[in-house]
């Protein structure tokens, strides 16, 4: 196999033109930086956890690019292209990583609070009555889905229009991705018992791919567009 990339928590190898192998490490990544300490068997845990959720989603009819687990800390996945020049992405582009992080928020916390204070987001945008003073930890009346960039050095918040233009998505495709995110969260709720306890910031994120038949996603995944045009997801480790 050919080693093609070193990430913060995994090594990436090319198996063949259509297949990659992820080798999960015991590294710890905090605020996009690797710290000196390691956690024994963390890589194995990440790999097994990803396989577990991909298996559940596959049974639910949600496509993903998991192929196999050749060892306890390695995963083989279908390869997709990463296109950094967004001007080359349109509705006809296939087999590429959709350059968006799709974030589903359930509580007022983290950066959402900062944007509420600055007026960039209003209470009514979140389903509250106009003028309501949102407090830290308030449960949102409805899940709030938004997108940030995925391939930039730092995540940047995007409007719906900006996200669709950057990723080459139609209105229908964009809504389908959001619906899939909510479906996955409902599956997590069923399996884990509490869909809204994933992080201290009250959010769950999903990055996507487009190939051609369908899209899908997983918790902390990347979206891709497949050959038939619809989105699905790919794994992300932290």
Q: What do these predicted ranges mean?
A:
Residues 10-11, 203-205:
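Short acidic loop-to-beta-strand element that houses the catalytic metal-binding Asp/Glu
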Residues 103, 199-203, 216:
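A structural signal for short, well-ordered beta-strand segments and their strand-loop junctions
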Residues 19, 196-199, 211-214:
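Coil-to-beta-strand transition motifs
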């Amino acid at each position: 196999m050919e080693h093609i990339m070193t990430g913060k928590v995994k090594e990436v190898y090319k198996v063949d033109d259509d297949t990659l192998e992820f080798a999960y490490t015991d590294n710890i990544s905090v605020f996009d930086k690797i710290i000196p300490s390691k956690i024994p068997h963390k890589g194995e845990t990440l790999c097994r956890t990803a396989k577990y959720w991909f298996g559940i989603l596959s049974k639910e009819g949600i496509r993903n690019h998991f192929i196999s687990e050749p060892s306890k800390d390695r995963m083989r996945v279908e390869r997709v292209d990463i296109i950094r020049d967004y001007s080359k992405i349109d509705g006809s582009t296939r087999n590429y990583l959709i350059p968006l992080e799709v974030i589903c928020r359930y509580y007022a916390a983290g950066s959402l609070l900062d944007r509420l204070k600055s007026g960039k987001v209003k209470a009514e945008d979140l389903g509250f009555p106009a003028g309501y003073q949102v407090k830290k930890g308030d449960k949102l009346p409805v899940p709030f889905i938004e997108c940030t960039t995925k391939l930039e050095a730092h995540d940047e918040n995007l409007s719906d229009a900006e996200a669709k233009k950057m990723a080459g998505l139609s209105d229908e495709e964009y809504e389908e991705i959001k619906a899939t995110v909510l479906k996955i969260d409902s599956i997590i709720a069923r399996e884990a018992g509490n869909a809204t306890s994933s992080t201290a910031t009250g959010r769950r994120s999903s990055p996507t791919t487009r190939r051609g038949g369908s899209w899908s996603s997983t918790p902390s995944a990347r979206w891709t567009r497949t050959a038939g045009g619809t989105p699905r997801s790919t794994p992300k480790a932290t």
